[in-house]
Amino acid sequence: MNIENSGVAVERPGRRVRRRTDGDVATCVRVLADVHRRDGYPVNWPDRPDAWLSQSCAWGAWVAELGGRVVGHVGLSRGGEGDLAPGVWSDRNGTNKDLTAVVSRLFVAPQARGHGIGALLIGRAVAEARGRGLHPVLDVVESDTAAAALYERLGWELMATVEQRWSPSQLVAVHCYAAAS
């Protein structure tokens, strides 16, 4: 991974991040399916993965390209009903949770890992959040140790681990992270 002294991944020839277009969604769904088969993300495969990708991206969605191919995705939005990190951040800081932006729907194709793509995507979402005057936060299931390791390498702080009921029979431990101030 190419990281500048500031700890921020930078674009290099052959890899870049750009705004997602409607034409990218089908490719993103295929990449997400590969990620799901390999890593189990998302934990519960959505009935409509195209809609799932878009529902948490109200403020923007970006794709990463490696060698001209879409290999990753990230979204940014205001916290929703199932997002725990905004409330945890708000409680810790004594501020309104509306001052947060949720980084979500982050994934990188298995064959594209090790090139700094995840860091580039997170960096783009963080820049957008900060440009809006908001603090970036995210939730990740406790079992996704690779994602947690990435966030921590990038300086994100684990605020809490909480139990979240996803269905009457599914209770999941979720880590709540906040970007460094």
Report the location of each language-model feature:
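A short beta-loop-alpha structural element at the N-terminal edge
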Residues: G14-R30
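Conserved active-site alpha-helix within GNAT-family acetyltransferase domains
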Residues: A119, G131, S143-A160, S167-Q170
